[in-house]
């Protein structure tokens, strides 16, 4: 048996539908669970009842994919209302979403991309992101954590490095950061494929070192897939060894921030997620 260090990070898993019943039956030792906020927006029903059961046994973190914090058209009022209601009902330990956009306007009508799309790292995009984050925090009356994105395109209009951009966001809004370690590595691998990053691991460690430690409220860990011409953050496999290396560096830098194992594609047995969570505790 591996002894857990006294100063080990708090670690949770993403609680997905295939494991709803099994988790509640087994009640394994976990520091917290995380769910996708939008899956529980319905008023009442089986999903919310299940989440309430989980909340009775574990602290819950709400992780969103739909606020579209970087969208110039602003925050969707209905979406924010549903999130605020869920936060009031569940009283989560953390609430988070992504530094991305998903909504825009075409021919006078709003459209939704149904995906997490990257934003440029420049002053104009920062102004939009800050305004939207502030609106969410004012509505929820609590701090929001903002996650760095896995981005498959870059913008010629970007004139800031991502860590500097995120640091400025936290300074202006008081929000925190959810640092997705796998996303950092996926982006570096794709930059290597594009001929712009000779040493992805070193680039990731530099990225981590550039982030203000006090702003980091949580880490994400996940797997990715190399398609040959692009690396995809698919959350469909175990955490890769280079990501563990970056994670160890991040924990030393950020002071053992809470960490979460994400697995959303080809979801395995619950035992596999628990094994990964145990590694995050002891790595």
Predicted regions and their residues:
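Boundary/entry segment of secreted carbohydrate-active catalytic domains
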Residues: 1-22
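C-terminal helical cap(s) of enzyme catalytic domains, especially alpha/beta-barrels
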Residues: 270-283
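Gly/Pro-rich active-site loop or hairpin
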Residues: 42-44, 74, 116-126, 187-254
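Acidic/histidine-rich catalytic cores of soluble enzymes
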Residues: 137-229
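Hydrophobic faces of well-ordered beta-strands that scaffold small-molecule active sites
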Residues: 9-15, 31-35, 60-63, 93-97, ...
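Acidic (Asp/Glu)-rich catalytic clusters
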Residues: 22-28, 45-62, 78-93, 134-139, ...
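Active-site acidic/histidine proton-transfer and metal-coordination neighborhood
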Residues: 76-177, 241
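Acidic-and-aromatic substrate-binding clefts and catalytic sites of carbohydrate-active enzymes
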Residues: 18-20, 37-49, 68-78, 152-160, ...
